[in-house]
């Protein structure tokens, strides 16, 4: 079965977005296509229709392929909990908590599973677009590699190598990567792509010719730098793209921030600018403060307490500042957090910010569920949907009211309260990730902020509807930038480009 693998000279060179683009291009050209990444390390995750957890990058790639996201597209997900430890998720379910060394030693046991899953893909699809991780030149990881050249060898896939010119040193990184590969690995590299180029491509051509001569691998295209309303799964990128926008939304950049893709729908609001708060000095006076999710809630709360950000949040709240906490951010806003079993940290209990009258107790069981419901504590007749990923539960105090009434969990009818809102109705929290994807709640909150500013109300758009158009734009950019005839030759697939 035809397959092609996108590897990179480093992390964040654009592998994920290029895979998404190729998936949409192949779909447009009439092929049944599927994305695949054997192992993803990310704190941005998603819950599938059957309640399993996978990386967000493969979710976008699935949508680009016209598919519903499923865990076989990302069978191994690593979620860092500390600098040296992570939660290992296999086929969407928690497998264990592991140190880096422990996981390195256990990787071989997953090879039969990966082979079996890939064989299923070969039977179901015309083309599989595979994404590598980091760089194949991490020679210290070569022996047990299951995500770069080790995977390419396992499934017999050709490789295209991507370099990022925006950071500088792209030719050195391409050359260095190729030099560190074995001869057998080098033979798999069939082309290179330079990504995020700004300027006149003609100026780049002498460099392209020189690097082709040195590495004996053809360049198949130069992709320009662009901005689209698509999520960036790999890193918490700066949001400062609309500095002069009247509505200022600040996001606390927690050390273990997770699911920061929750904020992506806010980018499409025309009069909104988003920025990260990394210290007390840059807190400012935002129209809305968001405290996002965290993979280590207690440690992150202690951190923002230590650096003075918590004091800023409390003072902001006392001035009727608008605060929205999601998952770990919601827990931080409460009265206290307990971790008696050491689920996230060795700290057994810590006092919260005491802004919302809720308390949290962590438990071993991880909740992963898709939900639908209605807002009940803020206003009426607002539908919401999203997904929950957490290992704790909240108890209400007398001064907190539920924010949401959940009516559906993983396709089953239910009726229970979720989230919280304070009596002043300016501070609220929820466990629901993706709650801003729908237009209704986001529009209500944005128009509340606009009213405070004396700005005319606007209608919000459903993020998913906009996303599909943005994927088409992405495909157009990448199609026009690459030698698609060469791409199809690498795939050994007949298409209109081969005629």
From Swiss-Prot:
Keyword Transmembrane recorded: no
Record InterPro entries: Class_I_gatase-like, CobQ/CobB/MinD/ParA_Nub-bd_dom, CobQ_GATase1, CobQ_N, CobQ_synth, GATase_3, P-loop_NTPase
SUPFAM superfamilies: Class I glutamine amidotransferase-like, P-loop containing nucleoside triphosphate hydrolases
Keywords (A to Z) from UniProt: Cobalamin biosynthesis, Glutamine amidotransferase
Annotated signal sequence range: none
Residue intervals of the GATase cobBQ-type domain: 246-441
Metabolic or biological pathway, per its Swiss-Prot or TrEMBL entry: Cofactor biosynthesis; adenosylcobalamin biosynthesis
Pfam families: CbiA (PF01656), GATase_3 (PF07685)
GO biological process: cobalamin biosynthetic process
GO molecular function: ABC-type vitamin B12 transporter activity; catalytic activity
Active site per UniProt: 327, 433
Highest taxon in the source lineage: Bacteria
Function according to Swiss-Prot or TrEMBL: Catalyzes amidations at positions B, D, E, and G on adenosylcobyrinic A,C-diamide. NH(2) groups are provided by glutamine, and one molecule of ATP is hydrogenolyzed for each amidation.
PANTHER family in alphabetical order: COBYRIC ACID SYNTHASE, DETHIOBIOTIN SYNTHETASE
Family per similarity comment: Belongs to the CobB/CobQ family. CobQ subfamily.
HAMAP family referenced in this protein's UniProt entry, alphabetically: CobQ
Name assigned to this protein: Cobyric acid synthase
Originating species: Clostridium kluyveri (strain ATCC 8527 / DSM 555 / NBRC 12016 / NCIMB 10680 / K1)
């Amino acid at each position: 079965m035809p397959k092609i693998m996108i590897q990179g000279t480093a992390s964040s060179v654009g592998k994920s977005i290029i895979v998404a683009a190729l998936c949409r291009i192949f779909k447009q050209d009439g092929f049944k296509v599927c994305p695949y990444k054997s192992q993803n390390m990310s704190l941005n995750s998603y819950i599938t229709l059957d309640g399993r957890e996978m990386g967000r990058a493969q979710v976008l790639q699935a949508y680009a392929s016209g598919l519903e996201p499923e865990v076989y597209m990302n069978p191994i997900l690593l979620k860092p909990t500390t600098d040296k430890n992570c939660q290992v998720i296999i086929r969407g379910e928690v497998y264990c908590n592991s140190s880096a060394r422990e996981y390195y030693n256990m990787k071989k046991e997953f090879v039969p599973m990966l082979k079996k899953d890939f064989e299923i893909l070969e039977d179901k699809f015309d083309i599989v677009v595979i994404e590598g991780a980091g760089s194949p030149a991490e020679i210290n990881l070569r022996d047990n590699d299951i995500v770069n050249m080790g995977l390419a060898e396992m499934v017999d896939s050709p490789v295209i190598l991507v370099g990022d010119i925006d950071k500088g040193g792209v030719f050195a990184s391409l050359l260095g990567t190729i030099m560190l590969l074995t001869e057998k690995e080098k033979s798999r590299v069939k082309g290179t792509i330079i990504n995020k180029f700004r300027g006149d491509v003609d100026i780049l051509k002498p460099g392209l010719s020189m690097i082709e001569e040195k590495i004996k691998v053809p360049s198949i295209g130069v992709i320009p730098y662009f901005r689209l309303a698509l999520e960036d799964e790999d890193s918490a990128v700066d949001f400062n793209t609309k500095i002069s926008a009247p509505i200022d939304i600040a996001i606390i950049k927690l050390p273990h921030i997770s699911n920061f893709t929750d904020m992506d729908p806010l980018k499409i609001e025309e009069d909104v600018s988003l920025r990260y708060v990394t210290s007390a000095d840059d807190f400012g006076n935002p129209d809305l403060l968001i405290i996002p999710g965290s993979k280590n809630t207690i440690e992150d709360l202690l951190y923002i307490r230590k650096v003075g950000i918590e004091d800023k949040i409390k003072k902001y709240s006392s001035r009727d500042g608008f605060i929205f906490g999601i998952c770990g951010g919601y827990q931080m806003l409460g009265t206290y957090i307990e971790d008696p079993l050491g689920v996230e940290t060795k700290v057994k209990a810590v006092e919260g910010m005491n802004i919302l009258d809720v308390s949290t107790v962590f438990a071993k069981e991880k909740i992963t569920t898709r939900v639908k419901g209605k807002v009940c504590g803020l206003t009426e007749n607002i539908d919401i949907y999203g997904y929950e990923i957490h290992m704790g539960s909240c108890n209400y105090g007398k001064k907190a009211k539920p924010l949401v009434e959940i009516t559906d969990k993983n396709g089953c009818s239910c009726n229970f309260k979720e989230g919280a809102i304070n009596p002043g109705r300016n501070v609220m929290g929820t466990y629901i990730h993706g709650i801003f994807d729908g237009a209704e709640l986001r529009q209500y909150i944005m128009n509340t902020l606009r009213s405070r500013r004396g700005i005319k109300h606007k209608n919000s758009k459903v993020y998913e509807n906009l996303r599909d158009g943005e994927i088409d734009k992405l495909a157009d950019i990448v199609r026009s930038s690459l030698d698609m005839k060469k791409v199809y030759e690498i795939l050994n697939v007949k298409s209109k480009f081969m005629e």
